[in-house]
Amino acid sequence: KYYGNGVTCGKHSXSVDWSKATTNI
C-alpha cells in the first residue's frame, strides 16, 4: 500500500522510497 511521500507498507514492514521522499524533507 502506498501512503504518499515515498512510503510504502506491507502487512509486516514499511519502507521509504527516498527518491520520492526527499522532496518533502
From Swiss-Prot:
It is found in: Secreted. Disulfide bonds join 9-14. It holds the Pfam family Bacteriocin_II. Its main location: secreted. Bactericidal activity against a wide range of pathogenic bacteria, including Bacillus spp., Enterococcus spp., Listeria spp., Staphylococcus spp. and Streptococcus spp. Has no activity against Lactobacillus salivarius, Staphylococcus aureus, Streptococcus pyogenes and Streptococcus suis. Belongs to the bacteriocin class IIA/YGNGV family. This is Bacteriocin mutacin F-59.1. It comes from Streptococcus mutans.
